[in-house]
């Protein structure tokens, strides 16, 4: 079996890379691909350990990056959702010749909440450790719980969960080692101090109702990164590209064309 990552490439135009989040796979982006492939050459990857790349594995962001570099286009617009936002941000910081613009979706430079040295909103560490424990026992149920958590608060929560579940089940299930490694990244990674080093234009997209990346994060980063752009989807929770698909795509297109 090949040890390279699975990529799906379609459309014509400037290169645009879509990176999914924890427990998911590239199929979550199908609506986005359908809308954008008339204007972009869209590259959708299954990250190591997920979907059609379930046979691969990576322990940290740089290991993921090294596997992405094998087939990633140069000078592309990178769009990363949730954990994928950490991956895309890491690419912009450490492999900047591959990234012309950076878009993070419902993502945070530090997913875990902290009280010290300053208050930082995010996922409570005990929630992340509970997911880790549950994952060892029953990873399918854990992923389903995470899907429900992602959609919670959105007016279309039931439809969002259904779409996420269909996407995950349409491809091979993720491997448990990669799921654990991903949770460790969500718990441990903190890119806040590195963000000002990003040299490419950056757009940060958020869902107003997101329970995993609280809207306060958008405000804090807006102050810390005044040169970046941000947009908040008022009806969305953690998956604005599904809940407000048309508005999401139009934000991407207008940022790409600037």
UniProtKB/Swiss-Prot annotation:
The molecular function terms in GO held by this entry are: pimelyl-[acyl-carrier protein] methyl ester esterase activity
What EC number(s) is this enzyme filed under? 3.1.1.85
**Main localization of the protein described in the UniProt heading:** cytoplasm
Q: Where does substrate bind?
A: 22, 82-83, 146-150, 238
Question: So which domain of life are we looking at?
Answer: Bacteria
One CC-aspect GO term: membrane
Q: Which Pfam families match?
A: Abhydrolase_1
**Enzyme category, top tier:** hydrolase
* Annotated active site: 82, 210, 238
Please give the InterPro entries that the UniProt record associates with this protein.
AB_hydrolase_1, AB_hydrolase_fold, AB_hydrolase_sf, BioH
What reaction does this enzyme carry out catalytically? 6-carboxyhexanoyl-[ACP] methyl ester + H2O = 6-carboxyhexanoyl-[ACP] + methanol + H(+)
Instruction: List the keywords (alphabetical).
Output: Biotin biosynthesis, Cytoplasm, Hydrolase, Serine esterase
Give residue ranges for domain AB hydrolase-1. 16-244
Where does this polypeptide localize?
Answer: Cytoplasm
BP terms from Gene Ontology: biotin biosynthetic process
List the pathway annotation. Cofactor biosynthesis; biotin biosynthesis
Family indicated by similarity: Belongs to the AB hydrolase superfamily. Carboxylesterase BioH family.
- What is annotated about its quaternary structure and interactions? Monomer.
Task performed by this protein: The physiological role of BioH is to remove the methyl group introduced by BioC when the pimeloyl moiety is complete. It allows to synthesize pimeloyl-ACP via the fatty acid synthetic pathway through the hydrolysis of the ester bonds of pimeloyl-ACP esters.
* Record protein name field: Pimeloyl-[acyl-carrier protein] methyl ester esterase
> Top-down, what is the taxonomic lineage of the species of origin?
Bacteria, Pseudomonadati, Pseudomonadota, Gammaproteobacteria, Vibrionales
């Amino acid at each position: 079996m090949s040890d390279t990552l699975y990529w799906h490439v379609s459309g014509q135009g400037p290169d645009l890379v879509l990176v999914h989040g924890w427990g998911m796979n590239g199929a979550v982006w199908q609506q986005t691909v359908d809308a954008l492939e008339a204007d972009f050459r869209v590259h959708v990857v299954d990250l190591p350990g997920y979907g059609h790349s379930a046979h691969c594995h990576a322990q940290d962001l740089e290991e993921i990056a090294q596997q992405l570099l094998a087939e990633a286009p140069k000078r592309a617009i990178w769009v990363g959702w949730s954990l994928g936002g950490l991956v895309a941000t890491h690419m912009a910081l450490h492999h900047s010749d591959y990234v012309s613009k950076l878009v993070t979706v419902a993502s945070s430079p530090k997913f875990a909440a902290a009280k010290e040295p300053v208050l930082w909103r995010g996922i409570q560490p005990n929630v992340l450790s509970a997911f880790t424990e549950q994952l060892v026992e029953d990873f399918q149920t854990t992923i389903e719980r995470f899907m429900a958590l992602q959609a919670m608060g959105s007016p279309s929560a039931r439809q969002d969960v259904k779409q996420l579940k269909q996407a995950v089940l349409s491809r091979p299930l993720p491997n448990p080692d990669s799921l654990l490694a991903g949770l460790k990244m969500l718990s441990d990674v903190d890119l806040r101090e590195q963000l000002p080093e990003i040299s490419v234009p950056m757009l940060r997209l958020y869902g107003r109702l997101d329970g995993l990346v609280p809207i306060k994060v958008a405000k804090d980063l807006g102050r810390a990164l005044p040169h970046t752009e941000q947009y908040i989807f008022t009806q969305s929770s953690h998956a604005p590209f599904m809940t407000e698909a048309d508005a999401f795509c139009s934000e991407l297109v207008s940022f790409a064309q600037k």
